[in-house]
Amino acid sequence: CTNTGVNLLAPGKTPKNNIQFLAFFVNTIMAAHKFGVLFMASIATQSNSHRLGAHEAPPAVMSVFTGSTLSAVLDSLEQRVSEKKMTPDEKTEIKLDIGKIPNILLDNTDRNRTSPFAFTGNRFEFRATGSSNNCAAPLIVINTAIAEQLTQFKEEVDTDSYTHLRAHET
C-alpha cells in the first residue's frame, strides 16, 4: 500500500490502474525470482527446514503461485509482446487488453497452499515463516528485494530499455 492506503497489488477498473497493478505484480514476482535464496535464508531455522522439507507444505523450494487467471493474462501478454519495436496499433491493442483484466476473486487464486509465496487476490502471502518465528526478518528481506527490483525497473523504463512488459527473464 501507499502512504495514503492505495493497494498497489489490487487490479483496477481502468487501464491506467491495471498497468500500475501489473508493474507491481510483475516486479514482485521478479524480486522473488532474483532474491528467492535470500527469502529462504530469512526463514531458515532447523525446525522450519525440517517442516518445509519433510512434513508440511509449502516445500523448501521458493516458488510463486499466481492463480490460473493471472497466469493466463501474463502468458497472453508474453506471447503477443516481442523484443522487436512495437507498432502503435500493437501498443494500443495491448493497452486495451490490459484494461480488461478481470476482477481477481479469492476463489481463483487461493487454491494452492503448497507455494511459499502466493498471490491471493490483492496481496502476496509469504507462507514459509514458521509459526513460532518472528516475521520481521523475512519482511525486511522481501520489502528490500521488491524495492531493489522496482528501482531497477524504473531505471530501465527511464532509459527506454523496456520496450514491453515481461513477467520473467530468460
Task: Outline where the language-model segments fall.
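Loop-rich catalytic cores of soluble enzymes, especially ATP-dependent carboxylate-amine ligases
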Residues: 1-111, 118, 160
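Generic structural hydrophobic/aromatic packing signal, biased to beta-strands
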Residues: 1, 28, 32, 119, ...
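Conserved small/polar residues in nucleotide/adenosyl-binding loops
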Residues: 163-170
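An acidic, glycine-/histidine-flanked metal-binding catalytic module
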Residues: 123, 127-129, 134-158
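Generic recognition of flexible, low-complexity loop/linker segments
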Residues: 111-116, 133, 137
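Low-complexity, intrinsically disordered regions enriched in charged/polar residues
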Residues: 67-71, 95-98, 136, 140, ...
